[in-house]
Amino acid sequence: MLIIPNRENLEQCVAFAKKHGLGFEYNDFFAPSLLDDAKRLEEVIQLYRQSGVPEYCTVHGAFFDVIPCSVDEKVKEISIQRIEASIEVAKRIGAKAVVFHTNYNPFLNSKEYVDKWVENNISFWSSELEKHSDIQIYLENMFDTTPDILEALSKSLCKYPNYGVCFDYAHAVISPTAPELWAKQLGRFVKHVHINDNDLVSDLHLAWGNGKINRKDFYALYEAYMPDASILIETSCIEDSKESFEQMKQEGFLTE
């Protein structure tokens, strides 16, 4: 189980993580402004290293407008720079994995476009997985309306031992496809899961139990299809992380 550390109350985050044996997923480094400020970037990396990096941690990579297979060469160039920078940060901080979004646009859905998109992304991510075989690279469903694209990618990329799917359950819930179908199609590829709550309409990142997601359904699907995957409580403040953690304990999903 992982939580998101917050620099504003880092000591509290570290204490809570140590008390319960939790890891961290660092969310600072997807910000373009930080990646572009070498001095500030180094300060943040050192802050986390000095605070005590948990034994298991991950980094959320850059995702704003990151399209590594764009037909626009300039967009492609900066996207690849962002991805490489994210991986470098993850390695420097001692993370076991780095998470990226598919960033697939579901409105471009002609067969020709989809086939080319899958082909190009398989080629790109295969290269990244080979180049960075010393770190896990996870692809997360974001704008995806079905698991089909991510499943197609995963069928080819799963031959790399450092590849996995990051299954964002809240994103799946607000998609037009039932969460059970997501779990069935992607389960065998899932190594990491993001959870938080919402109103079944928007991606609100509420504390677990403060929205309308059917939590029992999640527990059942997790146990059935991805029981070995790590889980991130993807909420932005330590209070919501604690509340979510306690909710899962009360419902018997977590034991200490």
Range-by-range predicted roles:
Residues 11-18, 96, 149-164, 172-256:
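Histidine-acidic metal/acid-base catalytic patches
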Residues 1-5, 22-26, 55-60, 98-100, ...:
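Hydrophobic faces of well-ordered beta-strands that scaffold small-molecule active sites
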Residues 63-64, 99-107, 195-200:
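Short, basic/glycine-rich phosphate-binding loops at helix/coil junctions
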Residues 2-12, 28-43, 67-69, 106-108, ...:
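Acidic-and-aromatic substrate-binding clefts and catalytic sites of carbohydrate-active enzymes
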Residues 69-164:
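Active-site acidic/histidine proton-transfer and metal-coordination neighborhood
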Residues 1-85, 255-256:
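N-terminal pre-domain/capping segments
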Residues 44-64, 119-132, 215-222, 227:
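Alpha-helix-loop-beta-strand connector modules within alpha/beta enzyme cores
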Residues 38-43, 75-83, 114-122, 151-152, ...:
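Charged helix-capping and loop-helix junction motifs
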